[in-house]
Design a protein with these regions (language model features):
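Conserved beta-propeller blade repeats
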Residues: 1, 35-53, 74, 81-99, ...
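Predominantly five- to eight-bladed beta-propeller fold
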Residues: 14-16, 101-149, 194-198
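Short loop/turn segments that connect beta-strands within beta-propeller blades
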Residues: 22-26, 68-72, 152-156, 203-207, ...
């Protein structure tokens, strides 16, 4: 499965669609007949379904779709108020997790006067108490936070899991498919101490919130081992420097027995994945502008697997690419 992005000269924009092919490159075809923008395809654990995100008819949002491999039929399973991201199947295939921005009420100092009919007024003033309220490439940021949700893979009403007024990112389903492991910065001064995120676990009814890590520095990118006993994650001890190397760590599912996997690799790593037998971890790293794929044992024995990983777009002079 992969996403193909094309430029539409008639609409002066981009369009994206999901394509599928066999491992040997044969039987290459578009997955659906839809003309909407599609993204984020994910195989179900049993390989019988594919979840993906597709834009709505009016292009004002997105919905979660399911494609049934045997029948080649597909359908929306959600009716969301926003656009979902980072969809992930639970291990038992019953649910789909996702993150979504939830807007907050905009700060208003006084009640504005009533606008006369047919009046042409300037836009309302923007009032914010946020330290970070603008971003390069997107301009002013909306008031609100990213939260975690789940929905039945058969469709239905989504359930919001997190509610604290912080951003919740980089999540993973737990072994019993009844909750998430996620990264967030719950510090009171999180806007100023923005690097200091921790890992947490939470049940899918929003209760039983537990903090798993506690140090000065970011912890994120958690992936659960196949047997459900170990969590691998990324992070570093923040020494308040411009650049700091991201390292690989392990801990027990309850947050105990934390240790760094000493790889002797003086490079930041990303994109963790467990091997099926749980004995190795796959990851990516950049070496002198060359993106590589490697694996390591739980004791730090590294094997380089792929060199010269590249992407299909060039936006900035950096390395890149993706691996499945």
């Amino acid at each position: 499965l992969y996403v193909r992005t094309e430029m539409d000269i008639m609409k002066d924009g981009r369009s994206s669609s999901i394509w599928i092919l066999n491992a040997d490159g044969s039987n290459h075809q578009k997955l659906t007949s839809s003309t909407r923008n599609e993204s984020s395809p994910r195989w179900s654990p049993d390989g019988k379904r594919i979840s993906f995100i597709s834009s709505s008819d009016d292009n004002n949002g997105s919905e979660i779709f399911i494609y049934w491999v045997d029948s080649k039929q597909y359908s929306s399973i959600s009716q969301l108020s926003g656009s979902p991201r980072s969809i992930k199947w639970s291990r038992n295939g019953k649910y789909l997790g996702f993150s979504m921005f939830v807007p907050e009420k905009t700060l208003q100092l006084v009640s504005p006067p009533r606008k006369p009919k047919n009046a042409e007024w300037a836009e309302k003033p923007r009032i914010t108490e946020r330290l970070k309220h603008e971003a390069d490439g997107s301009g002013y940021m909306r008031e609100g936070f990213t939260h975690l949700f789940y929905i039945s893979s058969e469709g239905g009403k989504p359930t919001q899991v997190t509610s604290e007024k912080y951003n919740h990112t980089s999540y993973e389903w737990n072994d019993n498919s009844n909750g998430f492991i996620f990264s967030s910065n719950y510090n009171e001064d999180w806007e100023y101490d923005f690097r200091n995120s921790e890992l947490y676990s939470i049940s899918y009814d929003g209760t039983d919130l537990k903090q798993l890590t506690d140090r000065k520095g970011p912890d994120y990118g958690a992936v659960l081992s196949p047997d459900g006993n170990l969590i691998a994650y990324l992070g570093y001890d923040d020494k308040i420097q411009t650049y700091q190397t991201t390292n690989l760590y392990l801990m027990d599912i309850n947050g105990g027995n934390k240790r760094e996997i000493k790889t002797n690799l003086d490079r930041s790593i990303s994109s963790l994945e467990w091997s099926k037998d749980g004995k190795r971890l796959y990851f990516m790293y950049d070496d002198e502008g060359n993106t590589k794929v490697a694996s390591t044992s739980l004791y730090g024995n590294i094997k380089n697997l792929v060199d010269n990983v590249g992407g299909t777009t060039i936006g900035r002079p950096y390395g890149g690419g993706s691996v499945s």
